[in-house]
Structures are given as C-alpha cells and as structure tokens.
C-alpha cells in the first residue's frame, strides 16, 4: 500500500493552478511502492504521476533526484521527466509535504525477465553511468558503508532468539569494513532497480 496521503478535488484544483497543464479530469491512488504516495493524474490528452514525498525521504535530497531525472530525460533516457511549476520549481507543497509531478511512462512491468531483457537493461544502465559522469551533481550515499554501522545500532532486537542474528550481522559488518576497497570508484547509480519499475511495450524495453 503506497497511498499514505489522501488528496481531494480541492487539492487537484490547487495543483492545476500551479502548473501550465490541461485541466486534471481524473485522479487515482497507486498502490504499488512502499515509500511515497503516488497518484495517477489524467487530463484530456495526457497522463502524469503525482508523487508526495513521505517522511523517510529527506527534503534536502529531493532536488537532486528532480535534477537528475530532468537531465537524464534530456539525454534521451526514457525515464519520467519532472514538470516545472509556474514559479520554475520542480517541487510544490501539498498537504504540508513536498510533492512533484512527472511525465507518465507507458508500458508494463514483467513478472520474469529473460536474458535478452537483462542485457537490454544492462545497456541502458551503462548508458546512464556514462551520461552521469559528465553531470556535476552528487549526493551522499545514505546507504553507504559509513551508514551501515549506525543503521545496525539502530535495530532493536527485542527477543533473545535474535541474538545470533545480531552477532552474525555485527561480525559480517566488521568483515566488510576490513575488506572495503580504499579507492573504490564513485558515481551515480540506479539504486532502485527492480522488475516493477522496468517497463516494456510488446516485449520491447522502453
């Protein structure tokens, strides 16, 4: 379930007033996903996705993702493109939360990928890596090696039956840190690459 924030017709009117777009005639919550609230918006001619950013997403990191999607889309990567509001920003305030509207990407995900599909996905990811080498934007990796120890310490193992798991994770983290390369190459990656956000039309990757 990924419709944590409910919106109504009054909110839709507010959205319409903030963007140079046709009148929104229909909106529906999207249940897929786990982190943010998503709605499908329809106008007479087009479809869009409204994303309302929930608590787990840091407000200061959102502009990075907006700019990255915008630049990738302009580099012929078939990903959602954030719309700019009338004041020139990709972000608006909705229900006291940050929100954005992005273009709708047609197609459907596949339950199972074959080798050809995986090869095509790999080519696009490689293309993204090459494109982003030239883009001068970056962010701290919130799931990087330096963040793993605080993350592990934040876990509250409430039962003694998990004590072995706690020991296992602690020992593994020590081993990872011990063997972590000191000069590991860095760059922008697709950190959310799952089959439910890889779209196909008639078996062709978008």
Language-model regions: role of each:
Residues 1-26:
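Juxta-kinase regulatory segment immediately upstream of eukaryotic protein kinase catalytic domains
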Residues 10, 74-76, 146-174, 178:
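Asparagine-rich low-complexity intrinsically disordered tracts
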Residues 18-25, 169-182:
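Short Pro/Gly-enriched beta-strand edge/turn motifs at strand-loop
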Residues 19-42:
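ATP-binding glycine-rich phosphate-binding loop
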Residues 25-28, 80-83, 206:
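A short, local hydrophobic-aromatic micro-motif
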Residues 34-42, 49-50, 82, 174-206:
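Active-site acidic catalytic loop and adjacent metal/ATP-binding pocket
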Residues 43-136:
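ATP-binding pocket architecture of kinase catalytic cores
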Residues 112-164, 184-186:
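A cross-family kinase active-site recognition segment
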């Amino acid at each position: 379930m990924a419709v944590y924030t409910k919106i109504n017709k009054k909110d839709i009117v507010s959205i319409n007033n903030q963007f140079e777009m046709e009148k929104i005639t229909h909106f529906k919550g999207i249940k897929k996903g786990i982190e943010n609230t998503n709605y499908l918006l329809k106008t007479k001619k087009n479809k869009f996705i409204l994303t309302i950013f929930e608590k787990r997403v840091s407000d200061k990191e959102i502009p990075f993702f907006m700019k990255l999607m915008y630049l990738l889309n302009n580099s012929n990567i078939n990903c959602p493109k954030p719309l700019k509001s009338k004041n020139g920003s990709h972000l608006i305030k909705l229900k006291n939360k940050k929100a954005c509207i992005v273009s709708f990407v047609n197609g459907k995900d596949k339950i199972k990928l074959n080798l050809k599909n995986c090869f095509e996905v790999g080519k696009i990811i490689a293309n993204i890596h090459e494109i982003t080498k030239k883009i001068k934007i970056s962010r701290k990796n919130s799931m990087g090696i330096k963040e793993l120890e605080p993350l592990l310490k934040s876990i509250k193992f409430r039962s003694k039956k998990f004590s072995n798991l706690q020991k296992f994770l602690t020992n593994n983290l020590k081993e990872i840190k011990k063997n972590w390369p000191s000069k590991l190459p860095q760059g922008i990656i697709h950190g959310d690459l799952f089959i439910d956000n890889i779209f196909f039309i008639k078996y062709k990757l978008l």
